[in-house]
Amino acid sequence: MKISEEEVRHVANLSKLRFSDQETKEFASSLSKIVDMIELLNEVDTEGVPVTTTMADRKTVMREDIAQPGHNRDDLFKNVPQHQDYYIKVPAILEDGGDA
């Protein structure tokens, strides 16, 4: 399946990203190859193969949930350059304030 440069531009725009024409062309090519590989994997016969949900040993996956005291909020904010009502203030990264 071919991913077009227009599709890459559309998704980039939705993500508030900008790419050069060369980058857009390279992304379209790379994404097309990835989709082709996934389509190839979909052709593999997995009938009768047990479902694998994890490769980790499940013996230690969960632990007892024990409440522990946290850090002193005032101590945590000592090194914060700007804050208001225990929120850290950071510079805006979107010129128009954005909708994110």
Curated annotation (Swiss-Prot):
Keyword presence, Nucleus: no
GO MF annotations in UniProt: asparaginyl-tRNA synthase (glutamine-hydrolyzing) activity; ATP binding; glutaminyl-tRNA synthase (glutamine-hydrolyzing) activity
Similarity annotation: Belongs to the GatC family.
SUPFAM superfamilies associated with the record: Glu-tRNAGln amidotransferase C subunit
Name of the protein in question: Aspartyl/glutamyl-tRNA(Asn/Gln) amidotransferase subunit C
Entry EC number(s): 6.3.5.-
PANTHER family, alphabetized: GLUTAMYL-TRNA(GLN) AMIDOTRANSFERASE SUBUNIT C, MITOCHONDRIAL
Disulfide bonds: none
Entry keyword ATP-binding: yes
Gene3D superfamilies for this protein: Glu-tRNAGln amidotransferase C subunit, N-terminal domain
GO biological process, one term: translation
Function according to Swiss-Prot or TrEMBL: Allows the formation of correctly charged Asn-tRNA(Asn) or Gln-tRNA(Gln) through the transamidation of misacylated Asp-tRNA(Asn) or Glu-tRNA(Gln) in organisms which lack either or both of asparaginyl-tRNA or glutaminyl-tRNA synthetases. The reaction takes place in the presence of glutamine and ATP through an activated phospho-Asp-tRNA(Asn) or phospho-Glu-tRNA(Gln).
Keywords, ordered alphabetically: ATP-binding, Ligase, Nucleotide-binding, Protein biosynthesis
Highest taxon, organism lineage: Bacteria
NCBIfam families recorded: gatC
HAMAP family associated with the record: GatC
Catalytic activity: L-glutamyl-tRNA(Gln) + L-glutamine + ATP + H2O = L-glutaminyl-tRNA(Gln) + L-glutamate + ADP + phosphate + H(+); L-aspartyl-tRNA(Asn) + L-glutamine + ATP + H2O = L-asparaginyl-tRNA(Asn) + L-glutamate + ADP + phosphate + 2 H(+)
Subunit structure: Heterotrimer of A, B and C subunits.
Gene behind the chain: gatC
Pfam families, A to Z: GatC
